[in-house]
């Protein structure tokens, strides 16, 4: 995290990826930009006008020639004076230019993400927009890129700002009621407070669901394959991975440990996890594998519950294995996979029973695997035609979850006790957690972690 002294420094870094290329860009930000331009270029270019110029070192030796651009603050990316030198992309040339700039007093190399950090500190970006820059650079799918662009445009920030405004207005109303104790109960019981609070909770819930999808697009969905031994879990892992990742035999209990495969479906990242078959076992090693299987199941974003279609015709989970589903976390999404349809002669397909997706397939022959792939894409939030939702991170989900807890506690106090002061405090804490998302209220340590993960030059 920057200190006040650091913030006064002028910083320099290569803005293009390291290595050889047709063009290499050196970016400078800070009050010494004009001095850099005068010493390396002979004069400072006109604002926002590209000039083709020779680049010199401080001994007036020619280093390169290329395009120079000057953006005076505050009308620049960082909000400070910014100078960009676009020369040839050889690493030696770029290094010579940067070394020449660093000879000027008051200039130092930029830390990772420091240009974006200065943009945030100068109110050119909020925190979600700054994070979207890093996400856009790191993205590996068109859908994720669209989502990152939506965040960069301020889509996520706008939703949070609207929610914060609603919390502030309700908080003002509640605190006004507290200031008039003789009428406080009338204020709190007139239906406006409870109605507005319920609307805010509903709004937060929808944002939270959208943020979860944005997180899955960024980080990838954790898919855990679970079921009884010999249901075909390892065969399904191999079919999705497109290779023989897991050993497959007719012997029940072959898989005793957790197996992981990182795959992409139309560039959407998925983490597929194969687990030991779930059963009572006297074998100590197999017991450990089963315990690990349950650990993975509890951390999953979605569970694929494998069923041997030869053994049961049941469709509903409670009819297949009620004890297993009783142990699943209450909000855990899952899909029932009826495997081995090549042997049971069930038709391949996908349907729903009581809002539970059921896929009929054969992991061994591959029939129905494409249906499963499409289903998983849908679960992640993939759409070939949409402009994408916004991108989100785990810290955003944590902040939203904390905000939701305080809202629900406030509602409980309102309904049970008409406790205006407690409700006002819960609304204050809600506002604080929401502001952490956009950076209105954020600790220096968190900012250091966020911007430290950026690449240098951004």
UniProtKB/Swiss-Prot annotation:
Mg(2+) binds at residues 234, 255. Binds 1 potassium ion per subunit. GTP binds at residues 230-235, 249-255, 274-277. It is an enzyme of class 3 (hydrolase). Its cofactor is K(+). (6S)-5-formyl-5,6,7,8-tetrahydrofolate binds at residues 27, 84, 124, 458. The keyword tRNA processing applies. Keywords: Cytoplasm, GTP-binding, Hydrolase, Magnesium, Metal-binding, Nucleotide-binding, Potassium, tRNA processing. SUPFAM superfamilies: P-loop containing nucleoside triphosphate hydrolases, TrmE connector domain. Residues 220-381 form the TrmE-type G domain. Transmembrane segments: none annotated. K(+) binds at residues 230, 249, 251, 254. One of its GO terms (biological process) is tRNA wobble uridine modification. One of its GO terms (cellular component) is cytosol. The keyword tRNA processing applies. Pfam families: MMR_HSR1 (PF01926), MnmE_helical (PF12631), TrmE_N (PF10396). Its EC number is 3.6.-.-. It is found in: Cytoplasm. PANTHER family: TRNA MODIFICATION GTPASE GTPBP3, TRNA MODIFICATION GTPASE GTPBP3, MITOCHONDRIAL. Homodimer. Heterotetramer of two MnmE and two MnmG subunits. Belongs to the TRAFAC class TrmE-Era-EngA-EngB-Septin-like GTPase superfamily. TrmE GTPase family. This is tRNA modification GTPase MnmE. It comes from Idiomarina loihiensis (strain ATCC BAA-735 / DSM 15497 / L2-TR).
């Amino acid at each position: 995290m920057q200190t006040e002294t650091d913030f006064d420094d002028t910083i320099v870094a290569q803005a293009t990826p390291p290595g050889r290329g047709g063009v290499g860009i050196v970016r400078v930000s800070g009050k010494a930009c004009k001095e850099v331009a005068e010493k390396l270029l002979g004069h400072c270019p006109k604002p926002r006008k590209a000039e083709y110029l020779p680049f010199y070192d401080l001994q007036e030796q020619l280093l390169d020639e290329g395009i120079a651009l000057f953006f005076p603050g505050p009308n620049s990316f960082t909000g400070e004076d910014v100078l960009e030198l676009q020369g040839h992309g050889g690493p030696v040339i770029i290094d010579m230019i940067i070394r020449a700039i660093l000879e000027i007093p008051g200039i130092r190399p930029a830390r990772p993400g420091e240009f974006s950090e200065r943009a945030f500190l100068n109110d050119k970006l909020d925190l979600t927009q700054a994070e979207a820059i890093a996400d856009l650079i790191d993205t590996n799918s068109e859908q994720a890129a669209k989502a990152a662009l939506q965040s960069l445009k301020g889509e996520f920030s706008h939703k949070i700002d609207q929610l914060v405004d609603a919390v502030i207005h309700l908080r003002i109303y509640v605190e006004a009621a507290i200031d008039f104790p003789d009428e406080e109960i009338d204020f709190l019981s007139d239906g406006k407070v409870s109605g507005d609070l319920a609307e805010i909770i509903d709004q937060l819930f929808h944002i939270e669901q959208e943020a979860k999808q944005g997180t899955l697009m960024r980080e990838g969905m954790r898919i855990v394959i679970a079921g009884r031994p010999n249901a075909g879990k390892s065969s399904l892992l191999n079919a999705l991975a497109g290779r023989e990742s897991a050993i497959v035999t007719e012997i029940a209990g072959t898989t005793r440990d957790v197996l992981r495969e990182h795959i992409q479906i139309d560039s959407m990242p998925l983490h597929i996890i194969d687990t030991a078959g779930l059963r009572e076992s006297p074998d100590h090693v197999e017991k450990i594998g089963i315990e690990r299987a349950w650990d993975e199941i509890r951390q999953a974003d979605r569970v694929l519950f494998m069923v041997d279609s030869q053994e049961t015709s049941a469709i509903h989970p409670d009819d297949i294995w009620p004890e297993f589903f009783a142990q699943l976390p209450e909000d855990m999404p899952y899909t029932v996979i009826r495997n081995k349809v090549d042997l049971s002669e069930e038709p391949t397909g996908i349907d729903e029973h009581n809002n539970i997706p059921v896929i009929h397939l054969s992991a061994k022959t591959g029939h129905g695997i494409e249906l499963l792939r499409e289903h998983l894409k849908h679960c992640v939030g993939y759409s070939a035609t949409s402009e994408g939702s916004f991108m989100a991170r785990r810290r955003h989900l944590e902040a939203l979850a904390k905000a939701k807890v305080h809202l629900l506690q406030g509602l409980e106090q309102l309904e049970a006790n008409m406790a205006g002061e407690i409700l006002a405090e819960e609304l204050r804490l809600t506002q604080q957690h929401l502001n952490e998302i956009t950076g209105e209220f954020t600790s220096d340590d968190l900012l250091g972690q966020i911007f430290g993960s950026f690449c240098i030059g951004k």
